[in-house]
């Protein structure tokens, strides 16, 4: 048997032509018989428990229920591979073909695809340039539509007619003296199929482009919307009439199974009930057409077939929801595909992978931005192959089994080896839902105690994470190529800007902003206290750690004499208040300590004194003064202090600061 695996790059949903639908379901057996059409609503025979022929579980269409065994039992064993049984017509092959072989139901009347009729926007209504309500009235047999107006004066193409109006026109057409010819009206999906088939997409697109050039406002937007749909049809090579179905694909039976429960009862997929309704109504319609039943009965049956197909494709999208036992809505094909528990998100995107784990995240403020804290328990499991390889290479163990025993015992050598292994080996962290590419980023792992993953608070906006119980998944890139890619493209420190807006996504918030504010805040009430002088920032931090000072105590920190301090005005010029418009004016001045303008707030230094070598030196304070509009001094703050020689050369200078500001300054410098 040929391999069933086939590589592909992507999955694309599009319109299938009637020929393609039949091609999915039809197969020619080795003996030349064409099979594939499901004609009976039966599933299995309740006496023999074998699938009914031409039913929803037919072995001739979908393949044998048991490996290498035909329906009647004439051929058994693998030696009969590929033989088609003369009695039952079943090909002898593996039963797993029932997972991918499809069938089809040939419809006695066309039906519309509910996605394209009732979707938002409705592609049928847009293409036909008709209101959705009118299109629905045609599909569900509430109104006629004019397909050919002929030579009738009051009729126009695509005009809607009620039943009474059409009966009057019909009387006119068939009267003896009537000269009206060429009038054709339709109802139901058949009429829509004709209207859609009459569309010449290239001509319509050209017309719309001309109209758009001469239109404005809402009309222009509507025309652009229609042109976009038509261009998409042209680009994909799809035809509008394919939105009306002549045949319905039947998915493989193993994807809608029927299983026997204890006590002889059966549990079945909802799809089987929905398919059964379609087949029953389709067969009934075909019989009514054969016996030439009245038009009103056939029309009603066509409407019921349309509703059955709607329920199969998307139950509840239009009309009443079809329910099963206990008034539970039946799961249609759309329900199986869409949503969090659907095929795509649950089964295709949500697969379990090796070398991954997940745990609760907690804040790791001491981490670098490109680091994450990985619990030891998780790290030893994720990096086990690398650890085992290194243990064997270092000669600590002889084989894999011995290495695993050493790991289980928690030998100290194992943790040393693990530290070596994770050094320079990035891991990827992902937080669901991954709505943009920054939802998964790479970090350098740091081993931590406990069972929670530590995350740097600055990367939280990218993941939309907070620490109220959020979980994150860890993935280990195995190959050297994937490790290099993670390091170069996905490392958190390389993803500073949002790909959507181009603005920084790594922005401090909440506790970080509050912490920065608290560290840099000033308490001016403490300025008048005794001045504390420190030679360097480390001494200030040491005094703070020993509880000699607190975060907001004003301290004089020595600076190198050549460090320039910016001021608003030249030194020793008293404030000159001429015209003030602001409510509060702030200026910064250098003034001697014995200045008459300002009080000597820190009087422990004399303004002028002699040094040991006889040089005359003078002390200056850098004042920050707040004035009112009238020029009255409201507040005075000392910002710096200098000691200068008589020639103006600065010998010593101090800046007034706080331990909190020194801490934040050193923290920022250490990570730059």
From Swiss-Prot:
MF terms (GO), sorted A to Z: DNA binding; DNA-directed RNA polymerase activity; magnesium ion binding; zinc ion binding
Binding-site positions, Mg(2+): 466, 468, 470
Gene Ontology BP, a term: DNA-templated transcription
Cofactor note: Binds 1 Mg(2+) ion per subunit. Binds 1 Zn(2+) ion per subunit.
Superkingdom per UniProt: Bacteria
InterPro entries according to UniProt: DNA-dir_RpoC1_gamma, DNA-dir_RpoC_beta_prime, RNA_pol_asu, RNA_pol_N, RNA_pol_Rpb1_1, RNA_pol_Rpb1_3, RNA_pol_Rpb1_3_sf, RNA_pol_Rpb1_clamp_domain
GO CC terms: DNA-directed RNA polymerase complex
EC number of the protein: 2.7.7.6
Keyword Acetylation annotated: no
The protein's role, per its UniProt record: DNA-dependent RNA polymerase catalyzes the transcription of DNA into RNA using the four ribonucleoside triphosphates as substrates.
Family note: Belongs to the RNA polymerase beta' chain family. RpoC1 subfamily.
Record-given protein name: DNA-directed RNA polymerase subunit gamma
Naturally occurring in which organism (per UniProt): Trichodesmium erythraeum (strain IMS101)
């Amino acid at each position: 048997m040929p391999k069933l695996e086939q590589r592909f790059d992507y999955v694309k949903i599009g319109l299938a032509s009637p020929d393609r639908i039949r091609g999915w379901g039809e197969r020619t057996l080795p003996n030349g018989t064409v099979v594939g059409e499901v004609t009976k609503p039966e599933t299995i025979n309740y006496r023999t428990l074998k699938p009914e022929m031409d039913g929803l579980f037919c072995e001739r269409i979908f393949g044998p229920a048991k490996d290498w065994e035909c329906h009647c039992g004439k051929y058994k064993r693998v030696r009969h591979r590929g033989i088609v049984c003369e009695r039952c017509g079943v090909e002898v092959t593996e039963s797993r073909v029932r997972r991918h072989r499809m069938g089809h139901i040939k419809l006695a009347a066309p039906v519309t695809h509910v996605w394209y009729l009732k979707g938002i926007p409705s592609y049928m209504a847009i293409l036909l340039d008709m209101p959705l309500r009118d299109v629905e009235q045609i599909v569900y047999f509430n109104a006629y539509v004019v397909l050919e107006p002929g030579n009738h004066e009051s009729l126009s193409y695509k005009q809607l007619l009620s039943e009474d109006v059409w009966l009057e026109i019909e009387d006119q057409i068939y009267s003896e003296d009537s000269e009206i010819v060429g009038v054709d009206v339709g109802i139901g999906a058949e009429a829509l199929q004709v209207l859609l088939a009459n569309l010449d997409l290239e001509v319509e697109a050209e017309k719309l482009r001309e109209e758009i050039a001469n239109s404005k406002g809402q009309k222009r937007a509507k025309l652009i919307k229609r042109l976009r749909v038509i261009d998409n049809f042209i680009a994909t090579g799809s035809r509008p009439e394919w939105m009306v179905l002549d045949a319905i694909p039947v998915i493989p039976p193993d994807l809608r199974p029927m299983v026997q429960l204890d006590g002889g009862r059966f549990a079945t997929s909802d799809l089987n009930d929905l398919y059964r309704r379609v087949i029953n109504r389709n067969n009934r319609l075909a019989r009514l057409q054969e016996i030439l039943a009245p038009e009103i009965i056939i029309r009603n049956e066509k409407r019921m077939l349309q509703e059955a197909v709607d329920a199969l494709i998307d139950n509840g999208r239009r009309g009443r929801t079809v329910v099963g036992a206990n008034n539970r809505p039946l799961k249609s094909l759309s329900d199986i595909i869409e949503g969090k528990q659907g095929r795509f998100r649950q089964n295709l995107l949500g697969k379990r992978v090796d070398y991954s784990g997940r745990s609760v995240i907690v804040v790791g403020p001491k981490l670098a931005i490109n680091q994450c804290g990985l619990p030891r328990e998780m790290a030893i499991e994720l990096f086990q192959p690398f650890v085992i390889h290194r243990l064997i290479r270092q000669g600590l163990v002889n084989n894999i089994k011995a290495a695993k025993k050493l790991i289980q015992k928690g030998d100290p050598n194992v943790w040393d080896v693990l530290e070596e292994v994770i050094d320079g080996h990035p891991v990827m962290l992902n937080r669901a839902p991954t709505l943009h590419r920054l939802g998964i980023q790479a970090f350098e792992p740091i081993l931590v105690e406990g069972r929670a993953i530590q995350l740097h608070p600055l990367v939280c906006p990218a993941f939309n994470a907070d620490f109220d119980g959020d979980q994150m998944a860890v993935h280990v890139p195995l190959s050297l190529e994937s490790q290099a890619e993670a390091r170069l493209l996905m490392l958190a420190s390389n993803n500073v800007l949002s790909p959507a807006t181009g603005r920084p996504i790594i922005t401090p918030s909440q506790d970080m902003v509050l912490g920065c504010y608290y560290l840099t805040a000033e308490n001016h009430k403490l300025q008048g206290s005794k001045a504390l002088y420190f030679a360097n920032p480390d001494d200030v931090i040491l005094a703070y750690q020993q509880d000699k000072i607190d975060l907001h105590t004003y301290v004089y920190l020595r600076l190198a004499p050549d460090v320039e301090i910016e001021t608003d005005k030249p030194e020793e010029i008293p404030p000159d208040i001429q015209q003030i418009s602001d409510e509060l004016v702030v200026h910064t001045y250098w003034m001697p300590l014995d200045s008459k303008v300002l009080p000597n707030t820190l009087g422990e230094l004399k303004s002028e004194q002699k040094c040991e070598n006889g040089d005359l030196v003078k002390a200056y304070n850098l004042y920050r003064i707040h004035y009112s509009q009238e020029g009255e001094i409201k507040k005075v703050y000392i910002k710096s202090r200098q000691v200068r020689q008589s020639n103006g050369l600065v010998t010593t200078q101090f800046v007034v600061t706080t331990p909190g500001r020194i801490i934040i300054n050193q923290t920022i410098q250490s990570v730059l």
